[in-house]
Amino acid sequence: MAKVYIENVRDLVEKAGEIREKLALATRRIGNVHIGGPMSATDVTTAIYYKYMGFDPDNLDDPNRDRFILSKGHNGILLFTIFCDMGMYDWDLLLDTYNTIGHPFGAHPNHKRVKGIEVSTGSLGHGLSWCCGIGHANRGRGIKSRIWTLLGDGEMEEGSNWEAILYAASHNLDNIVAVVDFNHASAAYETNQNERWGEKGGPEGMADCFRAFGWNATVIDGTVMKEIDKTLAALPEVTLNGKPNAIICSTTKGQGVGFMMERPCAWHIGGFDDDKLAEAEKDIKEYTAKKLAEV
């Protein structure tokens, strides 16, 4: 397998569209899958994996590699889809065996079964703690690679996250990048005006919380690839003695599929019939074309 690298923003937009189409097909073939979150996190995850991580399927044990921890582990189908797209796994194997006994692809990612998965996740609020441990170990070895983690806005209510956020800042772990997919909905309720995010609420309120804990924090439109690309490119150089970085991506659960975005909580998990699949595919093609026109 050759290392996949996409430089051009327009090509990243097209790749994100391809990933969304595959996620829609997976939702039809599998029948019941966490789908709202993967759709909203597709753009930033595509940019990280195909451009900024230097992800190399042939060198997954390189001690100097960047690492990606999917803290919101119920979005594992997104990483599995990317791995299949990169040629690491057979696409039909994923669709035919997903979440079945004895096969690698579970509803939550298992690092013992799926190469490319750094940490088994699913129980929320653990990704940042893993980042702290790996960040410390890398600093001790003088390794200046980044440790990325993708979190959900609902997940950010877990107290363990804020313990890790405080720890990372107080220990100057600037090799950590926390990316929050703020898609404004958990499995049960909207998260935008959560009182935990201060008077502002929403992504800006959450960013203020990160800053109060000693982090650099940036809020971006997580649906605009050009903005994602600019933000990731501007991350400070890792010194192993600076502030960790948080990127709060404002998105909508089910991003790119109209009927999902209209009822985001209802599409935390679900499945498509043939009609829904056709509608989703049409929406994704139109959405991708619109985003390409904006580049």
Spell out what each predicted region is:
Residues M1-I19, L23:
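N-terminal hydrophobic or amphipathic helices/low-complexity stretches enriched
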Residues K15-N32, D181:
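N-terminal capping segment at the start of a domain
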Residues A26, P38-S170:
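Cofactor-binding active-site loop characterized by glycine-rich and histidine/acidic residues
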Residues G31-M39:
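Structural motif
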Residues I69, V177, V219, A246-I248:
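Structured core elements
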Residues M86, Q193-E195, M261-C265:
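Short secondary-structure boundary/capping segments
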Residues G116, S120-T239:
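Thiamine diphosphate
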Residues C209, M225-V295:
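Glycine/aspartate-rich loop-and-adjacent alpha/beta segment that forms the canonical ThDP
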